[in-house]
């Protein structure tokens, strides 16, 4: 994502509009790392909110666009699992004011072989190899990604990089004078790149499409099971299917029992189940985001849904069991009061000496 915004900035600077274009537009349900990268690059970030059904508002985008806009940076489908059907209109609107369009394809798991960034007219995009192409997650994602650009942005690609010559051999090419240079040391985590490439080549075009279709099927099957649990809901797009994930809410259960989504998630670890953490920012109350992908069987999805239902039952009948979880882990319940108080934060030794 940093490479994307760095190339966008270099493009506008090369065209003499670097000082003019100081704003980046994103959506509230796009990955927050897009807004963070733009902010770190010195841009003012404008966030567009969805309409009542959860779809990114095209009218709100057009109202925010101006000659000061450097780019739109959006995830599609968004983290709600909702695909923006007007994505081409979004890109065209950005181009109409001279801005570029950056596509965060972190949620491409459900659209492989169905649609492409090029089809919507994007100028630059990236994939999360650990979310889409079978590489290890690596505690938040290994330091390797795949960026793709239009011809207009090709001169700004990071360098040096590995290229394929006309005779099929590979070589290391230095970046040109417009290149943003090296984004990270070496070429990232090479084993992750090799594994992703091997995974793609092993599946082929038909296999990638099958993976996407299975991911969508698994997600919508799990959604039907989860929405059958009293206290769970899926805000927005009422009655409509989602792509590869859903941002659910435990708000109804929380109002009834006082047990939060975080407490339910921690209790799930006692059953050896996934503890959800990816639902920032907290726009959906008491959120939990599930993304089953193509990897799980129906039996595994049934087991997960049944465990959710069991913990929801515990929240009503034995809430202290949930509130004091985990009970079956090496580290039991910990308090996070310090994390919620900036006055106690000490992320450096100097800060620790100053505060303690």
Short names for language-model regions:
Residues 29-31, 189, 281:
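Short glycine-enriched loops at secondary-structure junctions
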Residues 6-10, 197-202:
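Short glycine/serine- and small hydrophobic-enriched flexible loop segments
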Residues 1-167, 178, 258-259, 285-286:
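Conserved PLP-enzyme active-site core in the AAT-like
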Residues 76-80, 185, 212:
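Short acidic-aromatic active-site loops that bind/stabilize oxyanions
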Residues 16, 115, 165-183, 193, ...:
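Non-catalytic terminal extensions of PLP-dependent enzymes
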Residues 141, 188-195:
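Catalytic-loop motifs flanking and including active-site residues across diverse enzymes
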